[in-house]
């Protein structure tokens, strides 16, 4: 279709009937800030694809501009020009934001002088070729307007001669011609802006401090309610798991206030954290308690509310000064350290009425069960994603930036020290720090390095360039640390600092809410440490609207951990990780944003592809973490329901027949027994059906287990009522063939004794297995797990098929789900016209070492059209080409499946049905000379989504 028809069809869908063509990419859309979509995302999408842009926004702030800085930088590098018009209306637009825009060579900025009439425009126009996209409505270029506010905007598509577009551009050009060049008015406007801001500050200083008590936030309220319930039921221990910055210390203070102990002990691992905890408790309790400190420097043994470091308290001559039941209530902070002997000694000695443990990350790689220490009583669990959704944290703008190439080599795990501290790299770090900026009057940054020597040299280099900095390590005294933090955070301090360099002493516990920029100039060690370091900037603070996180990404082998950490997805599913890298900015809650430059994305994709998650050591670690949390042996469903590693990784491992096999290898406490025949039965289901890509086989098995029989009609009814699948008798018949081993000759060979049914009745063998409780438990677990996978991952089927758009399928999956009577996957390579279907499998990036005659030029022409080559030695009159050409007459359904490269494994993304419209006879080179081949162009029924298109096209 041409663009004019696309726009007309889009208008019909938008204004006549929404079901007309809902996949049309040109339809007018209503844009607001909702879960999974922000106005910001639409603007970013258009900026990334445009040839030119025009923006008119009454108000522009640094907060609104910062999440777009990566996009503007890439536009500058590509030479894409834009015009941005703003105003001095209400003196609201931030001069710092205007200066930032002014620093970009490709953007021209003007300021309209508001005199009599207000200036309220909020419009964004993007041109790509002869197509224009406009977004007009209520959203200014401010952070909240683009991310969380209730805003109403309309997005429309127009050709150059469209009336609405011409009126809009005409108005923009008129205002532009009347506006002032920014350099002519910015100095005067900045003075006006600053004087107004100072007046506002002055008014705030005259306000009296509120005398109201502190009010618990949503996390703290839920935690206190859970804790009360545990205490009332007679429990004496509990664990609080909550993301860094959500207010764990205050939560514990409110809980202790609720309990009202006579004597109380708070245990931490650093004196500085103990002092911060005392301040928090004083804010809650006011002057009603006697607070004391027990550290190397203070010995307030007699205080009723005692805050102690573990180093001091664990000394034999210190803790024995107290009776075992001295304290009614004990809080242990950063309790994931409790596996250490010093913590064990304290926990074994004291006998409080109640003990509360607090941590952001209870999982430990050394096998210590933190949950067991607290009787598996999880009072509250708030991870990063939950905390962002609840608005408990300061919004962050994360930028994944490619680290510098030094002497033609990219920084990696083996880069020599002198290259890490070279002049070029120092200048690069400072350049990026300045460009991406910060919220507030001056920069207050933490820089995490990989080693002390690097931190020292970088700090010296920063100081030499006029950026005051200092290094803090575990070797520094408590007073040195406190002095450095004061110089960094206090605007009245002499010898103010801009940067503190460190390796790991700020990973946890220390509260520096003023931090407005975090630089990560080291490889990611683990998702936990990544979140701990990112979390240093996430505490809310007055006049801090957001924190900037700059992650300098080299060719590190652990780069795959970055999307795992940011998403909180612990499934270790490679497709989930890739998906977050593509779409993370669209799904991250609240006003936060995530951006990667193209090189960084490629490096992370390479890391994902080159890393094996099918490691038994990883399986055991994740299994133990979940076992500790639950206090029992977890089943497959437990992994899924607790958001842990996807157990399909275990089931698909070549060394595992089924989950039972894994339990026997991984857990010495597991003493149940299954026969070889029972294991074989579980293996068939685990390897072939547990993925949940079709529910039919699983429902038949479930019916056999509970009823002893099934009928086609009963399964058809179940599919209709529980899964909204209509009129699918063919798939039911296909599922019966699969379970009877008629679908696959290989299955018949591998499972010669396997039998689930006799006609529509349960087989005697299956009935006998089910009498064994262990077998029954395992088979129901794998069936229910598969059905849950289907509901959550594969139920959005398209066009009446058993296939879900953008889900991934193997060739065997496709044969089964297209209801082919036999598994032809072993001979199904590029495509096959069979059973009135034609699946096409494309590997987008082909290996260099394949033969010339198979180097097919398969590629997207655009998001709607795919250009594909048949196998060689075919002509326009060849049988299969004619079959494809006559698809309408024969009702042939053509399905397109694509994977980026062989590094992704055996599965392909399903791109939906396609229709051929152009056939060209051409040739392809081979060792025997040019061979005939046919190039066919296909229209996609549903245009490929932007993220996947960019992924295939190497735009990332």
Residue spans of the language-model regions?
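Conserved segment of the helicase C-terminal RecA-like domain
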Residues: 527-532, 536-566
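Acidic, glycine-rich low-complexity segments with interspersed aromatic residues
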Residues: 679-689, 694-698, 705, 800-907
């Amino acid at each position: 279709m041409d663009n004019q028809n696309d726009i007309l069809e889009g208008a019909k869908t938008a204004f006549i009937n929404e079901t007309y063509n809902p996949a049309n990419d040109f339809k007018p859309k209503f844009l607001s800030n909702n879960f999974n979509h922000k106005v910001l995302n639409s603007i970013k999408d258009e900026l990334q694809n445009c040839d030119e842009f025009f923006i008119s926004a009454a108000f522009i702030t640094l907060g609104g501009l910062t999440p777009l800085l990566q996009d503007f930088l890439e536009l500058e590098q590509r030479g894409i020009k834009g015009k941005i018009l703003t105003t001095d209306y209400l003196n609201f637009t931030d001069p710092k934001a205007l200066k930032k825009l002014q620093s970009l060579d490709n953007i021209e900025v003007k300021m309209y002088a508001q005199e009599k009439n207000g200036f309220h425009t909020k419009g964004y126009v993007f041109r790509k070729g002869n197509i224009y996209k406009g977004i007009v409505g209520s959203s200014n270029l401010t952070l909240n307007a683009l991310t969380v506010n209730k805003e109403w905007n309309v997005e429309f598509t127009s050709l150059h001669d469209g009336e609405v577009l011409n009126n809009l551009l005409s108005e923009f050009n008129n205002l532009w011609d009347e506006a002032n060049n920014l350099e002519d008015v910015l100095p005067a406007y900045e003075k006006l802006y600053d004087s107004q801001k100072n007046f506002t500050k002055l008014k705030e200083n005259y306000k009296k401090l509120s005398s109201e008590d502190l009010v618990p936030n949503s996390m703290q309220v839920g935690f206190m309610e859970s804790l009360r319930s545990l205490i009332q039921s007679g429990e004496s221990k509990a664990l609080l798991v909550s993301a860094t910055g959500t207010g764990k210390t205050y939560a514990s203070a409110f809980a202790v206030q609720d309990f009202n102990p006579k004597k109380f002990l708070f245990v931490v691992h650093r004196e500085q954290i103990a002092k911060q905890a005392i301040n928090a408790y004083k804010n809650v309790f006011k002057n009603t308690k006697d607070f004391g400190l027990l550290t190397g420097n203070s010995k307030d043994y007699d205080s009723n509310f005692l805050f102690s470091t573990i180093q001091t308290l664990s000394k034999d001559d210190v803790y024995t000064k107290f009776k075992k039941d001295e304290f009614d209530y004990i809080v242990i902070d950063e309790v994931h350290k409790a596996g250490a002997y010093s913590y064990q000694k304290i926990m074994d000695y004291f006998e409080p009425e109640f003990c509360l443990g607090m941590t952001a990350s209870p999982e430990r790689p050394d096998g210590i069960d933190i949950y067991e220490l607290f009787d598996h009583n999880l009072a509250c669990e708030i991870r990063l994603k939950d905390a962002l959704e609840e608005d408990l944290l300061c919004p962050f703008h994360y930028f994944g930036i490619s680290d510098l190439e030094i002497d033609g080599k990219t920084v990696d795990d083996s880069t020599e020290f002198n290259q890490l501290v070279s002049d070029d790299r120092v200048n690069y770090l400072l350049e990026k720090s300045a460009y991406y900026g910060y919220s507030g009057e001056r920069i207050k940054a933490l820089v995490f390095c990989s080693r002390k020597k690097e931190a020292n040299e970088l700090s010296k280099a920063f100081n030499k360039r006029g950026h005051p900095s200092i290094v803090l390590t575990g070797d520094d005294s408590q007073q040195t640390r406190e002095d450095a933090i004061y110089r960094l955070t206090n605007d009245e301090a002499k010898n103010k600092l801009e940067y503190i360099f460190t390796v790991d002493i700020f990973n946890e516990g220390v509260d520096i809410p003023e931090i407005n920029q975090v630089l990560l100039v080291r490889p990611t060690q683990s998702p936990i440490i990544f979140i701990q370091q990112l979390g240093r900037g996430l505490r809310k603070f007055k006049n801090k609207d957001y924190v900037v996180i700059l992650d300098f990404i080299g060719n590190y082998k652990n780069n795959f951990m970055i999307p795992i950490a940011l998403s909180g997805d612990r499934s270790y599913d490679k497709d989930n990780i890739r998906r977050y890298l593509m779409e993370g900015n669209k799904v991250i809650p609240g006003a936060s944003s995530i951006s990667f430059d193209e090189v960084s994305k490629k490096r992370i994709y390479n890391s994902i592809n080159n890393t094996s998650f099918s490691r038994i050591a990883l399986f055991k670690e994740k299994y133990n973490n979940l076992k500790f949390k639950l206090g029992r042996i977890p089943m497959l469903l437990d992994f899924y329901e607790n958001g842990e590693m996807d157990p399909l990784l275990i089931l698909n491992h070549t060394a595992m027949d089924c989950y039972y096999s894994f339990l026997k290898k991984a857990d010495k406490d597991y003493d149940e027994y299954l026969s070889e025949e029972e294991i074989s039965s579980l293996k068939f289901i685990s390897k072939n059906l547990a993925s949940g890509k079709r529910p039919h086989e699983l429902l038949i098995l479930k019916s056999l287990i509970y009823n002893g029989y099934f009928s086609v009609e009963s399964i058809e009814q179940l599919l209709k009522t529980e899964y909204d699948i209509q009129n699918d008798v063919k798939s039911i018949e296909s599922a019966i063939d699969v379970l009877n081993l008629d679908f696959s000759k290989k299955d018949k060979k591998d499972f010669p004794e396997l039998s689930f049914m006799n006609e529509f009745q349960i087989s005697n063998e299956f009935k006998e297995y089910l009498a064994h409780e262990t077998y029954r438990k395992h088979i129901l677990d794998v069936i229910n797990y598969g059905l849950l996978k289907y509901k959550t991952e594969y139920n959005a089927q398209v066009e009446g098929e058993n296939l879900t758009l953008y889900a991934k399928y193997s060739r065997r999956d496709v044969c089964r789900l297209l209801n082919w009577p036999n598994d032809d996957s072993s001979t199904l390579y590029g495509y096959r016209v069979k059973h009135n279907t034609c699946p096409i499998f494309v590997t987008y990036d082909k290996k260099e070492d394949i033969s010339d005659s198979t180097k097919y030029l398969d590629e997207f022409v655009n998001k709607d059209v795919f250009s594909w080559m048949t196998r060689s030695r075919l002509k326009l009159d060849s049988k299969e080409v004619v079959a494809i050409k006559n698809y309408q007459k024969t009702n042939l359904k053509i399905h397109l499946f694509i994977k980026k490269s062989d590094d992704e494994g055996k599965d392909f993304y399903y791109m939906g049905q396609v229709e051929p419209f152009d056939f060209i006879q051409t040739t392809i080179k081979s060792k025997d000379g040019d061979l005939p081949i046919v190039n066919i162009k296909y229209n996609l029924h549903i245009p490929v989504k932007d993220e996947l298109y960019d992924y295939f096209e190497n735009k990332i």
